[in-house]
Design a protein with these regions (language model features):
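Aromatic, loop-rich ligand-recognition surfaces of beta-strand-rich domains
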Residues: 1-40, 69-112
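Extracellular carbohydrate recognition and processing domains
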Residues: 43-76
């Protein structure tokens, strides 16, 4: 079972909490291989929101903001989610609100 994941955003002074870095998203999963791109058979596992320590508007970052995003954000899956083999990410919003998404890495961890 999935336990948690880390999101590493694209880290650059002009892109921290900006651009296509994800602000809110959902992670969906399923055990069997999907036959097509339909959402049928997928289960929502978690809804996530990126956290900006200062709460300042887009384009205004503090040293604390930059340090926080540089370490990667950590998220715990809720208990009771089903076992999954396939992951799908549905982006709800980016920090700039533009129609593209960027990230450096997702790292998923399973329960021991």
């Amino acid at each position: 079972l999935l336990k948690r994941f880390d999101l590493f955003s694209v880290v650059r002074d002009d892109l921290n909490y900006n651009g296509g870095n994800m602000k809110s998203w959902e992670i969906w999963g399923r055990e069997d291989e999907p036959a097509n791109s339909s959402w049928d058979g997928w289960t929502k596992l978690i809804t996530c929101n990126s956290f900006k320590p200062s709460g300042k508007p887009v384009g205004e970052n503090t040293d604390e903001d930059n340090a926080y995003i540089g370490k990667g954000e950590k998220f715990d899956f809720p208990s009771g989610i089903p076992e999954v083999r396939y992951i799908r990410i549905k982006v709800l919003d980016s920090w700039s609100g533009q129609g593209y998404v960027q990230f450096s890495e997702f790292t998923f961890y399973k329960s021991e």
